[in-house]
């Protein structure tokens, strides 16, 4: 068994977007390895992504009954609850698929939590075929997110966070 070292500071990297993600994923894994607390892990993942990419907002919403409820995040204050099918987060939850929105003002039913947000990517967190939350990332730049972000954020959610979420019984 490989033991991950404690990460006290992120190694901020330069290079292509893919290279930055490839460098960041092992650091995120080291941050959360061995920690069973969901809030602590999601908080550290949010902080790592925000610190590396300097996006406007990075955070999680978790499914509680019939709505998404704000979880750990980094950035300006945010909407606390989102109904299924509403806005980008609620639509990604409803459709159980990643959504990239180049211009949030053109997204039907967009929920404007911050007037500074111009583009957004939302990645559902799926366990046993059920969406249990979403990773939401906002940028101040229109058209900021692309297939590279989709690929690596899905990898972070599925391959890193997924392993450390508490098992529901």
Give names to the regions the model predicted.
Residues 2-72, 163-169:
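Intrinsically disordered, low-complexity terminal regulatory regions
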Residues 7-13, 138-156, 163-168:
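Regulatory loop-to-helix N-cap segments in sensory/regulatory domains
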Residues 47, 155-158:
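Generic recognition of well-ordered alpha-helical segments
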Residues 56, 63, 67-115:
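Regulatory sensory and allosteric helical modules in signal-transduction proteins
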Residues 57, 122, 134:
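Short hydrophobic/aromatic beta-strand element in the GNAT-like acyltransferase core
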Residues 119-126:
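A short, aliphatic-rich beta-strand micro-motif
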Residues 126-139:
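Sensory-domain boundary capping and coupling elements
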């Amino acid at each position: 068994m490989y033991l991950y070292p404690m990460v006290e500071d992120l190694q901020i990297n330069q290079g292509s977007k893919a290279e930055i993600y490839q460098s960041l994923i092992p650091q995120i894994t080291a941050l959360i390895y061995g920690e069973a607390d969901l809030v602590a892990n999601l908080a550290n993942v949010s902080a790592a992504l925000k610190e590396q990419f300097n996006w406007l907002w990075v955070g999680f919403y978790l499914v509680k009954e019939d709505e998404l409820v704000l979880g750990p995040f980094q950035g300006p204050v945010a909407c606390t609850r989102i109904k299924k099918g509403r806005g980008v987060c609620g639509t990604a939850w409803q459709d159980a698929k990643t959504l990239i929105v180049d211009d949030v003002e053109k997204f039907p039913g967009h929920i404007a939590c911050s007037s500074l947000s111009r583009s957004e990517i939302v990645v559902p967190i799926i366990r046993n075929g059920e969406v249990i939350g979403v990773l939401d990332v906002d940028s101040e730049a229109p058209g900021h997110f692309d297939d590279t972000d989709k690929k690596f954020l899905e990898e972070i959610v599925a391959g890193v966070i997924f392993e450390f979420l508490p098992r529901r019984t």
